[in-house]
């Protein structure tokens, strides 16, 4: 996962893309304007052409992305945070990191032990199948603890 500044940069880039796409699509779909007879009476309840639908769609996308940008900006650390607060936050993060590393090491250790048991069981199964195919009497090996 990216850090907050990268997320903010991506959101701003997305917002710029949406502005460019909105302008391009609206220019492409806009009907030619007639300057001699300008009509302003438009039915507001129902879009009369796809251009209005595109305008509503892009307005919603741009508004949502702008809200995302605001949320990301608000989540950035403030300038008022002192060095002591930052140091305390870093110590807390370091402790959490060490705890997570210890849990990870334990899980890896248990996974390795389980893998070893599975490999031993597979080797026993393979030996039993070989003995069965060759017609040799099967010898049971005592289970390892």
From Swiss-Prot:
InterPro entries per record: Med7/Med21-like (IPR037212), Mediator_Med21 (IPR021384)
The chain's coiled-coil residues are 79-112
What broad class describes the main subcellular location of this protein? nucleus
Subcellular localization: Nucleus
Disulphide bridges? none
One Pfam family hit = Med21
Q: Name one GO cellular component term.
A: mediator complex
Keywords attached to this entry: Activator, Coiled coil, Nucleus, Transcription, Transcription regulation
Q: Name one GO biological process term.
A: regulation of transcription by RNA polymerase II
Regarding protein family, the annotation reads: Belongs to the Mediator complex subunit 21 family.
Assembly state and interactors?
Component of the Mediator complex.
Q: What protein name applies here?
A: Mediator of RNA polymerase II transcription subunit 21
The species this protein belongs to is Danio rerio
Q: Which gene encodes it?
A: med21
């Amino acid at each position: 996962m990216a850090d907050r500044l990268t997320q903010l940069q991506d959101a701003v880039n997305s917002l710029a893309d949406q502005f460019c796409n909105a302008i391009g699509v609206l220019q492409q779909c806009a009907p030619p304007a007639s300057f001699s007879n300008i009509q302003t009476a438009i039915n507001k309840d129902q879009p009369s052409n796809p251009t209005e639908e595109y305008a509503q769609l892009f307005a919603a996308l741009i508004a949502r992305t702008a809200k995302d940008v605001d949320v990301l900006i608000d989540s950035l650390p403030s300038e008022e945070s002192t060095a002591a607060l930052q140091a305390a936050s870093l110590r807390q993060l370091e402790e959490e990191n060490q705890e997570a590393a210890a849990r990870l090491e334990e899980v890896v250790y248990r996974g390795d032990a389980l893998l070893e048991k599975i490999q031993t069981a597979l080797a026993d199964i393979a030996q039993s199948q070989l003995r069965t195919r060759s017609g040799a009497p099967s010898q049971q090996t005592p289970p390892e603890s």
